[in-house]
Amino acid sequence: MAGHSKWANIKHRKERQDAKKGKIFTKWIRELTVAARQGGGDPGSNPRLRLALDKALGANMTRDTIDRAVARGVGASDGDDVEELGYEGYGPGGVAVMVETMTDNRNRTAAAVRHAFTKCGGNLGTDGSVAYLFDRKGQISFAAGVDEDSLIEAAMEADADDVVTNDDGSIDVFTSFSGFYAVRNALEAAGFMAADAEIVMLPTTSAVLDLETAEKVLKLIDMLEDLDDVQNVYSNAEIPDEVMEQLG
């Protein structure tokens, strides 16, 4: 499963851009609201809300802002309904792209996503057109310096799918979608505190890009991520390190 680290360069680039754009608060406010609406306002009994709460606190969101988002989700405050919608399509070079959104106006969001695909030389597809190329997984990440052997042993005992050690020494533990929270809790109980933990869409196949195509694909990803309603963008693009270095 070491191949999953191929997409780390795009992910890290995305995280830097999220912070730069100041979009991260909006993203987690929406996730808090939807998580609370679906599973209730108690993070102790709502694992999705607990994960969103951890992310929001990690982004230095104030407790007051968090509480308002949760209250909106459980119906304690007024506000337009926010729903989760997914979009699928192909970008330049035949790269498969999945877009996760949260929106209070599906027509606005669909039009904006379609425009991004069209402008960047891609095509917005129908439901299922590229979803079969991805698996929904849990990814629990640990910073370099953690005891690798002990972490691997604890992860396997917790029924994790695999453990990947990256070039920088950080370690990713991958889980099934359904087993994500149980594995995360088991690792915490064993004394391993994650640097990050999230549900992701991992590609089962990859499209290796040259410099020209990589520029076009990243332009599409940037344009999609700039949309206010977009939460996450996943692709099966594999950009070799030497190409990523040329991109800067």
Curated annotation (Swiss-Prot):
Short name of one Pfam family: TACO1_YebC_N
InterPro entries xref list: Integrase-like_N, TACO1_YebC-like_2nd/3rd_dom, TACO1_YebC_N, Transcrip_reg_TACO1-like, Transcrip_reg_TACO1-like_dom3, YebC-like
Keyword Transmembrane attached: no
Subcellular localization(s) per the UniProt record: Cytoplasm
GO process annotations (BP): regulation of DNA-templated transcription
One Gene Ontology term of the molecular function aspect: DNA binding
NCBIfam families: PRK00110.1, PRK12378.1, YebC/PmpR family DNA-binding transcriptional regulator
Protein name (record): Probable transcriptional regulatory protein PSPTO_3980
